[in-house]
Amino acid sequence: MRIKLYGRVIGIFLKKHSFINVLISLQLIAVFVIGIIMTSIIDEKASSYEAVKPLLNGEGLYCGGYFLKDNENGGLLENTDEIKTQLKDVDFISSVNFASLQTGVDTQTNEVKTAYALVYDDYSANLFRPTIEKGSWITDSKQSDDIPQAVITRNYQGYNVNDIAEFETENGTLKVRIIGVIGDNEKYLGANSEYESNEPSYQLMLSTHFNCLNDQLKNKGFTNEEIALKLESLGYSADSIVYNEPVLFFTDKEWNKTDLDSVMSDSLFIKYNRNISDDEKLYNRKYINENLSVLSFAIQFSQLNNNSQTIVYRELYTLMPIMCAIYLLVLIASVSVNAINCKNNIRNEAILYLGGAKRKQLLTINVIYNGLICIVSLIISIAGSLIFYKAGLFSKTVITLGWKPITICLIVCAVYILSLIHI
């Protein structure tokens, strides 16, 4: 009987003040969408650093460049054992190796088109796991196959999960089974050749890839005119749609099935033992600089870690006040509109009170009424964001629908309902 009464009264409130209710709902949807966007941005900034933080917390060197056997004889190194034997007090060395595969010939420029292979050892494959758009990451595959398995970036060839991709090599045609696809603008472990900063940080260790060069330039803030000039400088017409070469990711176990060589010309992580002395660090750094490689960089973990913390905290300190200000403005507006709504309902509540309804019952009706509007708004926000996400409209952004954005929305929903309880 009481449930029917509550339902009837709430139905009257919703119908009588439909315009105000829609206005409140739109404001709440704005709050939830802003929450999803801002939480995704903050999480993206923090989570990338958190993934590599355990490594950077220790002592060691992060190196990038072409690693040679020695200055006199040349010859690119293919494994880390040759380096470790020459260094002092090293715990382990992990690498990301590089290889090039031919995919065809560009019809406009007659240049050979290539795909780039990154080969991870066990440590580097698990150090940073990119967000997979389809399929699984290289360490998660449970398939047993004589054909090498790899993950690929989104690509103009249209290779998808379970496809057999073919590439030309010095040993003939190489067949690769695709087990996963990484979307545009997703980070992966590999030296970022485009990173320019006086504060080298974790961002130097992570690269991003776009299937389309036009989209990549647009993501960097290039105008349409600047993109046209850039394309012309590369030998294309100004209105061309130019595709980047795909990147493939292998474990060293899978790469060994190819009988092809890979070289240490991307990333090298040299982790020292905890008690390494300053003299041994100096020796290692000097040996790398003078004997082993044509270096792009060799940076201490401690420097990367300190700069990473500075950059992440700086960005969070910038974003948090903006997020809080927007939240408060929209939330206060929602509460204000709801206060007007409550004022309009005073007459109805007075009638119920005179009819025998107790204050606790009126409070329950008010909570259910406001909670219903808030929950419906939350469902619309999440459902709408999910539709956009599935449609790929967020593919070039950092917006995600993980548990963190949804948790923030639930907290805001609870705070909103509690703020409207008449004490």
Protein language model features and the residues they cover:
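Short, membrane-interfacial amphipathic segments enriched in basic
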Residues: M1-R8
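Conserved small/polar residues in nucleotide/adenosyl-binding loops
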Residues: I421-I423
